[in-house]
């Protein structure tokens, strides 16, 4: 039995998230498993580094699978991409030993959230960015983003239905910056709670709209109550861009993305 790690890029527009759902509900995981199973001529189960909500995208979702099938790495990639829908693509594949696990060996995960801040919605970026037409106080949002760095109890910033056993997470960085008409939130942590990034972005957007001051974030943390924070930002602008592992696994590091923004690494 051989274990493979794979890097996957996908648009989440047509899917109910990464994880396999009930029959008849499209998911990224199930779509890829179906294709890999045909290539391997045996059932394949993918284990992803994380889960994404419906409508959320990824530029480098890492997953692994085990198989008895013998194929060159190029054969797996070419075979899968020729059969996958155009909104899912295998970017790389690598043979691994059994010690590797896409989820449990990950040391950190990283997301970017993209806002298009302009008077009119962008037709060509439909469901690839979140459109905000109001003028935002960007400098205030930039300062507020740093409030989320460090180790905190993120109870206020997770979904009410989040199933994680405990809400404490360490955020290595949480940076917001301008890129033309785009605002980009770049956040890396040892792990994320359900809706955590979208709830943080929702908070920053409300601060940018003048609904409350930066220091109010402290009160939100202290409340440890989802009702103490504001909106959950839409899934459209959210991208899973990287998963980090110990150097011993020597996985590829493709450009972070989203590629059409041409952002610095």
Curated annotation (Swiss-Prot):
Keywords: Isomerase, tRNA processing. The keyword Translocase does not apply. Signal peptide: none annotated. Substrate binds at residue 111. GO terms for molecular function: RNA binding; tRNA pseudouridine(38-40) synthase activity. It catalyses: uridine(38/39/40) in tRNA = pseudouridine(38/39/40) in tRNA. The keyword Transport does not apply. The active site is at 53 (nucleophile). Its EC number is 5.4.99.12. GO terms for biological process: tRNA pseudouridine synthesis. It holds the Pfam family PseudoU_synth_1. It is an enzyme of class 5 (isomerase). CDD domains: PseudoU_synth_EcTruA (cd02570). HAMAP family: TruA. Formation of pseudouridine at positions 38, 39 and 40 in the anticodon stem and loop of transfer RNAs. Belongs to the tRNA pseudouridine synthase TruA family. Homodimer. This is tRNA pseudouridine synthase A. The gene is truA.
